[in-house]
């Protein structure tokens, strides 16, 4: 029974009839490092003891040696369709180390429980718990000294790729409705960066959107694996952010947005559509879209040394260093 496959989503994962889940990628991890890597040190800190969940915190080595160095704060949510990858994988450790070095910021990379064992909305709930934990440091009296001493809570940025970008959107919306810290008058978020955001719908978003039915069916099946209780499938407002009439973006809880998309990515039109909907919503901030020509989904993670990935990092770090 344990060898009989119920669902085969290779090269991502397999689910066996016994209920066992075999993830085929994104399971490797690397430890944090007290020795500088690219000028950055890191450590893991528990944010939810009840669920055994941690964040990985990154800090420029030079800031660690100073007691009064306040830096922008980046909170990052990893991608993987809500199903694969972790905050501790070599891919994300490398990306966050590079991001912190380029942006001269403090970063908190959030690990959350994954579907299908923990279906949506668990990844969103864990992410919100992590974000609230981060903001317990706003007065300088939180659990983690690196955040108490070095995080500038007037310059907080959220970012994520793919499913992580989806999480970022929902965190920014929720932050506009619920205070992240007592006494905080606004959301506490300066801006968000959505890297190849995972939004989708049953029907193409426009005439340029992919009409490949096989691909669209695969994406729907993958979503239903993560969110089996979604009555509307990929038209669930958690995923169909762009076309759903029930989703109002006017209350997005930040002042500026950077959306980064890739020309060959099936999700490219969703990113453009998100920005267009945001501009039309009555939201008062500024939004910019940057498209990487000739590239596919999360290419910047897969080949970080290519010219287009270097340009992505340049835009990414510039957004953070630009402040409010």
From Swiss-Prot:
What reaction gets catalysed by this protein? Answer: a carboxylic ester + H2O = an alcohol + a carboxylate + H(+)
Expression (tissue specificity): Expressed in leaves, stems, flowers and siliques.
Q: Which UniProt keywords apply?
A: Acetylation, Hydrolase, Serine esterase
Supply one GO molecular-function term: carboxylic ester hydrolase activity
Cystine links in this protein are none
Quote the SUPFAM superfamilies the UniProt record gives.
Answer: alpha/beta-Hydrolases
Q: Which GO terms describe its cellular component?
A: cytoplasm; cytosol
Q: Does the keyword Metal-binding apply?
A: no
Instruction: Give all N-acetylmethionine modified positions.
Output: 1
**Per its UniProt record, what InterPro entries does this chain match?**
AB_hydrolase_3 (IPR013094), AB_hydrolase_fold (IPR029058), Carboxylest/Gibb_receptor (IPR050466), Lipase_GDXG_put_SER_AS (IPR033140)
- A Pfam family in this protein? Abhydrolase_3
The Enzyme Commission number assigned here is 3.1.1.1
Which residues of this protein are catalytic?
162, 265, 297
Chain location of the short sequence motif Involved in the stabilization of the negatively charged intermediate by the formation of the oxyanion hole per the record? 78-80
User: What is known about what this protein does?
Assistant: Carboxylesterase acting on esters with varying acyl chain length.
**What protein family does this chain belong to?**
Belongs to the 'GDXG' lipolytic enzyme family.
Q: Mind telling me what this protein is named?
A: Probable carboxylesterase 12
The uppermost taxa in this organism's lineage are: Eukaryota, Viridiplantae, Streptophyta, Embryophyta, Tracheophyta
Q: Which gene encodes it?
A: CXE12
